[in-house]
C-alpha cells in the first residue's frame, strides 16, 4: 500500500524476477527467483500493472498461448481459459480481439493469464484499477476463493479501503 510513486510496482517486479535488483534476492516458497527462475515462474502468477498483452489475439487464444508457455497441454489450456473467462464474465467477449477490449476487460484477461497455470502465489499490481464495481466484487470473490484453497495473493494498491477489505496481513 502506498501513494503513486512509492515503489510498489518496483518492489513487485523485483520480487517476481521481472526486474533485476542491484543486490539481494527474493524467495518464493523457498525458491530463489534468480537462481531457479523456471521453478519460480511455475509457482508464480504475475499481473504487472500496464502490461501489454498480445492484443491481436482473442482472449481465449491469448490464454491458451500463456497456458502453453507455462507447460499446459493445449486442451487443458483451452479448458482453463474457458473456465476463467466464464468466471470473469468475459465468455461473450471471446471472439473479439483484445485490442477491442475496454481497459477493465483487458485487466480481467491479464488476471486470467496469471491464474491459467494454477500458481501457488499470485502477484497482482493494481488489480482493481479500471475495473467496474461489479467486476471488482467478482474479482474479490475469486481471490478469496483462491486463498481458501491454499493460494497466496500479494497485491498492490493505492486505495487503503480495498486493502483493508481484502487482505488478512
Regions found by a protein language model. Give the residues of each.
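ABC transporter nucleotide-binding domains
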Residues: 1-168
Amino acid at each position: 500500500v502506498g501513494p503513486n510513486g512509492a515503489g510498489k510496482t518496483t518492489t513487485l517486479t523485483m520480487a517476481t524476477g521481472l526486474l533485476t535488483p542491484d543486490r539481494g534476492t527474493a524467495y518464493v516458497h523457498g525458491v530463489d527467483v534468480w537462481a531457479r527462475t523456471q521453478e519460480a515462474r511455475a509457482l508464480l502468477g504475475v499481473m504487472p500493472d500496464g502490461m501489454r498483452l498480445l492484443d491481436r489475439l482473442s482472449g481465449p487464444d491469448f490464454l491458451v498461448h500463456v497456458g502453453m508457455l507455462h507447460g499446459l497441454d493445449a486442451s487443458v489450456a483451452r479448458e482453463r481459459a474457458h473456465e476463467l473467462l466464464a468466471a470473469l464474465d468475459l465468455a461473450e467477449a471471446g471472439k473479439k480481439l483484445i485490442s477491442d477490449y475496454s481497459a477493465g476487460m483487458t485487466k480481467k484477461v491479464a488476471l486470467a493469464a496469471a491464474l491459467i497455470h494454477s500458481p501457488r502465489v499470485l502477484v497482482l499490481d493494481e488489480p482493481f484499477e479500471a475495473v467496474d464495481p461489479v467486476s471488482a466484487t467478482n474479482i474479490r470473490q475469486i481471490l478469496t476463493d483462491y486463498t481458501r484453497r491454499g493460494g497466496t495473493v500479494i497485491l498492490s494498491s493505492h486505495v487503503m479501503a480495498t486493502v483493508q477489505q481484502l487482505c488478512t496481513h
